[in-house]
């Protein structure tokens, strides 16, 4: 299946309201330690969209004793804070110690995992990929409650950005942006999220901020305007983030 057809296939989640679904993948090696990596997808998709990233991380030597979690939630009709609370409630039903957990969120999922922290869920590190911490680019439509909750004017994002639990945990936040260069030059956005928004420039001090670069031989508008954002779901395009997460697992 081509990348474009794969993207169109991912839009199946737009028209229906998905229930919370959480699946854990047992570690490659048995251990008495409790170490978890929870990966949360972005808008208009489900956990399958992040399996490439999960599989890449799972095969790292230092990940052999880590338990990975795939999360699916509704991104269309449910504001992300409500989804975060539902995910936390579901995880609390599991008989696991989550005190040593890495939270990874792609796009909208980055706000979901931050909201999980705001709700009191523990983490040793939080990684966001192409997340609109200060809203998406202004030309992206936000027609339903899910994407509207991401807007820079959303009360949900304003509340999250001043939440005491979120503020206290920012020394564990690792924020990644994607920018790209095509025939029209360098663009400081990924087609959906600006570099400053993905890096959470208004959040103050965080553990680290990183920018990843993509290069195109043709104008991105000849493909899809948000193609760079979408390509951040493919491990080969975000190797700096993969390596960084690997170090966090050591």
Explain the meaning of each model-derived region.
Residues 2-250:
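Lipid deacylating catalytic domains
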């Amino acid at each position: 299946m081509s990348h474009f057809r794969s993207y169109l296939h991912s839009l199946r989640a737009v028209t229906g309201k998905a229930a919370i679904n959480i699946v854990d993948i047992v570690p490659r090696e048995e251990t008495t330690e409790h170490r978890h990596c929870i990966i949360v997808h972005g808008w208009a998709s489900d956990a399958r969209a992040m399996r490439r990233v999960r599989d890449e991380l799972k095969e790292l030597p230092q990940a052999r004793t880590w338990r990975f979690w795939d999360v699916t939630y509704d991104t269309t009709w449910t504001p992300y804070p409500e989804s975060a609370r539902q995910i936390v409630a579901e995880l609390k039903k599991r008989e696991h110690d989550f005190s040593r957990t890495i939270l990874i969120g792609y796009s909208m999922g980055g706000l979901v995992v931050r909201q999980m922290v705001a709700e009191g869920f523990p983490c040793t590190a939080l990684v966001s990929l192409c997340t609109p911490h200060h809203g998406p680019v202004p030309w992206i439509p936000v027609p339903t409650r899910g994407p509207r909750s991401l807007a820079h004017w959303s009360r949900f994002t304003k509340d999250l950005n001043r939440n005491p639990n979120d503020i206290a945990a920012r020394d564990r936040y690792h924020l990644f942006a994607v920018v790209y260069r095509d025939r029209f030059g360098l663009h400081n956005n990924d087609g959906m999220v600006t570099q400053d928004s993905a890096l959470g420039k208004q959040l103050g001090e965080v553990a680290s901020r990183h920018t990843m670069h993509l290069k195109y031989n043709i104008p991105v508008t000849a493909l899809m305007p948000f193609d760079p954002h979408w390509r951040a779901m493919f491990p080969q395009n975000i190797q700096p983030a993969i390596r960084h997460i690997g170090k966090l697992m050591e």
